[in-house]
Amino acid sequence: MATEDNEFYLRYYVGHKGKFGHEFLEFEFRPDGKLRYANNSNYKNDTMIRKEVFLTPAVLKECRRIIAESEIMKEDDANWPGPDRVGRQELEIVMGNEYISFTTSKIGSLVDVQRSKDPEGLRIFYYLVHDLKCFVFSLISLHFKIKPI
């Protein structure tokens, strides 16, 4: 189905283990067009939310555009803060014949970014993750909350 030039996969995870157990948000865009979303919060005994939806090629193309314009594929996480007790973030991307994987701590604000050893690279990561989360939340909300008239 997918050739080397149009191969696309993305996985994002952010989470921590605390007094409410393992709490996390994870989503992935798969090569077959499936978007998988999971959100686990045990706060007040919440249950895990899992959603799956198939996306059109136009939506996947927009996701690829967001990633390409961010230039995240040129970055390196060697000087980013490592995962700690606050939590961890992971971003894995395959676009064409390029593959990149990042692991860093949870980022609370731009102040954390500015204090890092690589503020430029981490800023790109921070804003890309923000854009991707907004994109995914919009897609999931549109797909599952629209009520027929």
Swiss-Prot record:
It is found in: Nucleus. Disulfide bonds: none annotated. One of its GO terms (cellular component) is exon-exon junction complex. Keywords: Nucleus. One of its GO terms (biological process) is RNA splicing. InterPro entries: Mago_nashi, Mago_nashi_sf. Gene3D superfamilies: Mago nashi. Belongs to the mago nashi family. This is Protein mago nashi homolog. It comes from Euphorbia lagascae.
